[in-house]
Regions:
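An acidic/histidine-cluster motif and surrounding catalytic segment
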Residues: 1-94, 105-133
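Catalytic acidic motif of RecA-like/P-loop NTPases
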Residues: 102
Length: 133
């Protein structure tokens, strides 16, 4: 899928703003780092003590005057997931972005039931964005 970078950036900003307003969450700064598997493995090792790739890592820093966060996304893993789940790359990318935002809003996915709730919320926002039916 070919998408102009400007259009993609605008779409990401729109979904970020929409999710945060809908979830009643205010953040001063969200930094996105789009990277490869090796980079996200390095972050996983350093901060989470995992030695494997993940599609996303989300950090919220509340020890500063600003409400600041980092969302790190492996585009290689997003691509593999889009193939595995028979989804378009863009839908999977936006699903992962929404997933990270939901973590910043306080949602967890550390149990099966919490994963189900989070997946429903991801689908809700993907539908509102017109990305899925």
């Amino acid at each position: 899928e070919k998408v102009k970078i400007k259009d993609l950036k605008t779409s990401i900003i729109s979904i970020v703003n929409f999710v945060l307003v809908s979830e009643r969450k205010s953040l001063d700064v969200i930094n996105f780092l789009f990277c490869d598997d090796n980079t996200i493995i390095d972050f996983n090792k350093k901060y989470l003590k995992h030695n494997f790739e993940t599609d996303i890592i989300t950090f919220l820093y509340d020890d500063t005057d600003l409400s600041e966060s980092d969302i790190i996304i492996s585009l290689e893993t997003v691509n593999r997931n889009s193939i595995t789940y028979k989804s378009s790359y863009l839908i999977e990318l936006f699903r992962v972005i929404i997933h990270g935002l939901l973590h910043l809003c306080g949602m967890e996915d550390n149990t099966k039931s919490k994963k189900t709730v989070m997946r429903k919320k991801e689908n809700y926002y993907l539908k509102l964005a017109g990305l899925i039916n």
